[in-house]
Amino acid sequence: LHEQVGRVEHDKFSDFNKKTVDLIVSEARNLAVKEILPTQKAGDEQGCVFENGQVKVPESFHRAWELYREGEWLAMTDTPEYGGQGMPMTVGTAALEYMVGANPSFMLYSGMTHGAARLVESFGTDEQKHMYLENMFSGRWGGTMLLTEPEAGSDVGALTTTATPRGDGTYHIKGTKIFISGGENDLVENIVHPVLARIDGAPGGTAGISLFLVPKYRVNEDGTPGEFNHVECTGIEEKMGIHGNATATLALGEKGDCIGTLLGKENKGMREMFQMMNEARAFVGLQGLAVASASYMYALDYARNRIQGRHLLAGKDKEAQSVRIIEHPDVRRQLLTMKSMVEGMRSLIYYNAGCIDEAGTTDDPEEKKRFEALVEVLTPIVKGYVTDRSLEVCSHAVQVYGGYGYISEYPVEQLMRDSRIFMIYEGTNGIQAADLLGRKLSMHDGQAFAWYLSAMRNTVEEARGQTELADLSEKVGDAVTRLESLAEDLKERVKAGGVMNAFSFAHPFLEITGDVSVAWMLLWRAHVALPKLLKKTGTLEMPDVMEKAGKNKEAAFYAGQWKTAAFFINKMLP
């Protein structure tokens, strides 16, 4: 963990030493396991209840939310000026993974609130910051993101919600928004909605969209929630999964004055909202990782305890005893597939968080540009690839359980249902693939993707110096070269006018880029692990390593990194 978490050395993070980081992550795990995890199944079964325009979340959510608030977890990585704790993004990501894995629908209320608050922090006036930020970062008030309309889903430029000036600097907002996560709930005293709308007379398409802050309740002079602002919840969706999160339809200004204030500049709403969208995409990638990790751990535990069938080597010996299913080759294959994906994706997401930390602390403009570009390249991979693989991991978990995995009594059934939405919301994975191919390959005249490939090659060169990793390094290096050639080929197709042809390969390109990225991260993990393994065992000869790993937990962990990298690179890397 400490090889990636909290590594940025800067005065801003001077309080976050190893001991402090361990304490933070340990406390996050305790809250997740003891308080949030028990709400997962109850929240799924009870769901949200819509009645007379109000939504009641599952009863168990209230205690968990209060404890989450008391621990000041919502604003872990934010400025202390508005109630944040100022942690490195890597530390916050590690802590958040536990809680999201415990109950993704519960933590979605937090994720949306945080993203909305960050919009206010980035683009709000001093008055707006004073009015909203502390209440939102504390979790006393909630937040959402109002983009989607019945006829404007991925095509946001087709929205019809209007903003009419009222003559006092505020606007009358009118329109309908759908699929709003946490759009109405009884966890918080007020809900602050960032709303995309078009000011009367503004240009059509995305060029004429502005961003507004629209609270559920207007804010009194003393900062308390006041008069209802006519943000009417007209219903919530019945969904396949994430039942504990209210997916609302909201009618703004249909039955009375719905008043909003401009956030940022007129007609710049899409540019501003992209900040929240990119944060949300990273959060959804973390949801994918966390749920995949939970599925893997459940499947591993089940396979270690479920006794069924004789060992393959027992042949036709009718006297042979049945063994735990983890002894069966195909179960082991599935578990190794899950393990390699989860660990590779985890390191990729933590690497992305580290780039955010570096970009936010470096004084070198060129380094800042490079790290920000790496985050841009990583965003569609983290959102698109990770959530695709998350569903795959969940499917493997169900398969390991066999028939029991298909029954709601067991947790993997719910996790698979919950994970399906991750591939859809905050920009479908088809959009993520198009973004990677259409925007990120050409960003900074191709330099952004070149920096990404260079980071991979740096790891390959470092790992190549270890004899035990020479072969794996060669294979990853070859994959990086082939990925570079593929990217150049697709760019040339676009330049030659073959746009439709090139973009038909967008999703396979995302998948290949993700697989190479996971191989890169697993190679890095093995590179870090081998010296530690040698220190624990005194040898890197595999038979001796495995014997000693059976007696030493840490040695087993480090040996596992080596074996996992070898499995993925040899068996799964394209």
Where are the predicted features?
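C-terminal amphipathic alpha-helical interaction region
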Residues: 443, 459-574
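A structural-propensity feature for long, helix-poor, extended segments
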Residues: 114, 125-128, 132, 428, ...
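Conserved phosphate/anionic-ligand binding catalytic regions in large, soluble enzymes, centered on
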Residues: 77-88, 105-107, 285-292, 388-407, ...
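Internal maturation/activation junctions in enzymes
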Residues: 48, 109-113, 124-166, 176, ...
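Alpha-helix capping/hinge segments and adjacent helical runs
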Residues: 242, 351, 373-451, 567-574
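Amphipathic, small/basic residue-rich leader segments at the start of a protein or domain
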Residues: 1-107, 127, 131, 357, ...
